[in-house]
Structure formats: structure tokens, C-alpha cells
Design a protein with these regions (language model features):
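N-terminal "arm"/small-domain region of PLP-dependent enzymes with the aminotransferase-like
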Residues: 1-51, 59, 357-359
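Conserved PLP-enzyme active-site core in the AAT-like
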Residues: 5-7, 11, 70-268, 275
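Short loop segments at secondary-structure junctions
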Residues: 28-29, 213-217, 244, 303-307
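Conserved N-terminal alpha-helix of the aminotransferase class I/II PLP-enzyme fold
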Residues: 28-78, 103-110
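Active-site/binding-pocket entry motifs
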Residues: 29-35, 217, 340-343
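PLP-dependent enzyme catalytic core of the Aspartate aminotransferase-like
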Residues: 109, 118-120, 131-132, 136-139, ...
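Short, well-ordered beta-strand elements within core beta-sheets of diverse protein domains
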Residues: 240-249, 297-305, 358-362
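Conserved small-domain helix->loop->beta segment predominantly found in fold-type I
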Residues: 259-320, 324-331, 340-350
Length: 368
């Protein structure tokens, strides 16, 4: 995969020997004749519908996932809504994990009722209960692995068996692991979503998402994207392709740092629980070890009940390497605090009672 990310999507011999593809900033694409225009002879017809710049990134990401194709979205959340709305319609029912990303939960709660789409949330650690939630109009199961906040690893093999049994579509947010550590297509998932904003871009300076699929699923996603007018800046595409070139190296360092730090935090008496699937004590460690090739740099910790939020704030404010802010996947380390137990848009199978801190380790030296 290191070789693929280094070379796919570029053809310097078609570009005056220049390794990086050019950035095409355009809306209009000109035809030589009216006959050519009417017959749509050109490969590219309008800037929003694709250019050589977007084609380079589409080809590259599709290759690392061994997918037939993909569409680019303006953000990770736009990729999620694109994946959802291309698979379900008015009158359908969908199942989502209880620990799903807060913005995805909010979209379901606020938009699905308006669109006459029914939904239920399931506990990703209780798949027997998942099967009882399936209705006659259920069309799809949405997955995250691990869960966004408390890092539950779902048994994807069992979920795929359920999907096959009831003829359901499946889609998954794979931002945490990327194709480097986990390829959902190997398990039969229909649609894979990733926030390019995070690891692929890797520099915390652009926002973008991607939705990958095969066959009819890809056709549906491409149709929705075109009808919804989804568009991504060519400059952002260029920077994402730049980030993709070093993805395996950055992910390896981020992963190394996170596991080292997680093991260190396991031995801190003020810490009650380290939510990192690569740790042997994690409830889903065996599932992670079975399905994943590695762990990314994002995890969380819960402090003991007697540790106050003020004390954790003081600790966070004193850190020199870690920035305080949302998002993750870039080259620098970040921390953020969330009230997981009381948020309207965050629900988890494990509810932390102590102060919760989410940690992302970047590319720094672990000894610093």
C-alpha cells in the first residue's frame, strides 16, 4: 500500500514530466464544435462533474480500497449524508449504532422525520438486540468501528451475516482506521465512508470526505452526488492528494505514539479506563485483533470519579505538545473534553461517569 499511495493517480509523462497533477480551476469546459458539444464527445463536460484533478484523487483512493470507484464530498459529514441518502428513501427504515458520531445522530433525529425515514439506534455490543430491531421496511445498517467516543469494536462478520439474511445494505464510517488498517470491502460492506479531513489530508488545513462503493451502489452514489450539486475545491483535492502520499508513514507514527501513551496511561492511578482497542484489557480487543491491521492515534480516557473537571482542565492547559481542539488526523497531537453522558447528540453503550478526555497523537517524538 505504501507504493500505491506514492504513485497512483499521477502520470508525469502526460504532464510534461511533472509528477504532481495540475490543478484545474474551471467551471466551463469548451468544445471544438457544436456537434461535439451536442454529442458530449468530451470526457469532461463541466467543472462540478469532474476534472483531471478530481479524477487523480478518485483513482488514488479507489485503488487503496480496491473499490470500483468513489465520489468526493465537501466534508466528512457531507460524505456521511451522501452515503445515507443514496441508499435510503422516504418510507424506509435504517439502523444506526448508539455510539454513532454526534453529527450523524443529529442528522438522523432532525432530518429523517422530515423525510419520512424511520430509524432506530442499536447497541453495537448487543447484536442479538440488533436483529430484533429489523422491520419489514428496514433497508440498511450503518456501522462505525470503533465507535466514535468510547471505541466499541463491532463484530462486523456477524453484522454482515445479518445483512445477508435480511437482504440489507451496509455502510460504514472507516475514518479511524483508514484503508491502511481496515478494509470493510473485504468483509462485504456495500458503502465505505471516510473523512479525508482527517488522516488522508493529514495537515488540518482542508475539509473533505469520500464515499466508496461498487456496481449499482456506486451508480446510486454518483447519481445522488450529481443531483445534490456536491462540489469540492480543486485546491483542496490537490492538497489531499499530497497528504495521501505520506499517509502510511504518518499513520504508523501516530499509531505508535498512541499505543505507547495508552499503555503509559493504564498505569496512572488517576485514570480509571483507557479506551484503546489495541490494549489487551479493552473489552473488544479480540475483535480488533481479528479484523484490524493496526490502531490509529485516536483514543479516550476516563478519570476516576474523584478527579474533578477543574483538575483535568488544569492538566490540559499545562500541556505544551497537545493542542486543545476538535478534529484529529493531522500531524500534531490534540486533546478535547466532552460531556459524553449528558450530550443530546452523544450516546454510548459505555457511559463514563468520570471526566472524559479524548486524545489524538500526531507525528511528534513520543519522548517529548
Amino acid at each position: 500500500v505504501e507504493t500505491i499511495t506514492s504513485h497512483v493517480g499521477k502520470n508525469p509523462h502526460e504532464n510534461h514530466g511533472i509528477p504532481s497533477p495540475p490543478v484545474y480551476r474551471t467551471s466551463t469546459i469548451l468544445n471544438k464544435t457544436m456537434e461535439s458539444y451536442k454529442n458530449k464527445d468530451l470526457k469532461y463536460t463541466y467543472g462540478r462533474n469532474g476534472t483531471p484533478t478530481s479524477e487523480s484523487l478518485i483513482k488514488a483512493i479507489s485503488s487503496i480500497y480496491s473499490a470500483e470507484g468513489c465520489v468526493l464530498a465537501s466534508s466528512g459529514m457531507n460524505a456521511i449524508t451522501t452515503g445515507l441518502m443514496s441508499l435510503i428513501k422516504s418510507g424506509d427504515h435504517i439502523l444506526l449504532p448508539d455510539s454513532v458520531y454526534g453529527s450523524t445522530r443529529r442528522f438522523a433525529k432532525e432530518e429523517f422525520p422530515r423525510l419520512n425515514i424511520d430509524y432506530d439506534f442499536y447497541n453495537s455490543r448487543d447484536l442479538k438486540n440488533l436483529e430484533t430491531l429489523i422491520k419489514n421496511n428496514t433497508k440498511a445498517i450503518y456501522l462505525e468501528s470503533p465507535g466514535t467516543y468510547t471505541f466499541e469494536v463491532i463484530d462486523i462478520i456477524k453484522v454482515m451475516e445479518i445483512c445477508k439474511k435480511y437482504d440489507l445494505k451496509s455502510l460504514i464510517d472507516n475514518t479511524w482506521a483508514t484503508a491502511i488498517y481496515f478494509n470493510p470491502f473485504d468483509f462485504g460492506v456495500n458503502v465505505v465512508i471516510e473523512a479525508i479531513t482527517k488522516y488522508i489530508s493529514g495537515h488540518s488545513d482542508i475539509m473533505m470526505g469520500v464515499v466508496l462503493a461498487n456496481n449499482d451502489d456506486l451508480i446510486g452514489i454518483e447519481r445522488w452526488t450529481k443531483n445534490a450539486g456536491v462540489y469540492v475545491s480543486p485546491d483542496d483535492i490537490f492538497m489531499s492528494l499530497r497528504g495521501l502520499r505520506t499517509l502510511p508513514l504518518r499513520l504508523e507514527q501516530s499509531s505508535f505514539n498512541s499505543l505507547k501513551l495508552a499503555k503509559f496511561l493504564e498505569n496512572i492511578k488517576e485514570v480509571k479506563y483507557v479506551m484503546h482497542p489495541a490494549l489487551a484489557q479493552h473489552p473488544d480487543h479480540k475483535l480488533w485483533k481479528r479484523d484490524f491491521k493496526g490502531a490509529s492515534g485516536l483514543f479516550a480516557i476516563e478519570f476516576n470519579d474523584n478527579i474533578s473537571e477543574e483538575a483535568v482542565n488544569k492538566l490540559a492547559n499545562s500541556l505544551e505538545i497537545f493542542g486543545i481542539g476538535s478534529s484529529w488526523g493531522g500531524y500534531s497531537s490534540l486533546i478535547s473534553m466532552m460531556n459524553v453522558s449528558e450530550s443530546r447528540n452523544i450516546k454510548t453503550s459505555y457511559i463514563p461517569k468520570g471526566v472524559y478526555l479524548r486524545i489524538y497523537t500526531g507525528s511528534e517524538n513520543i519522548n517529548d
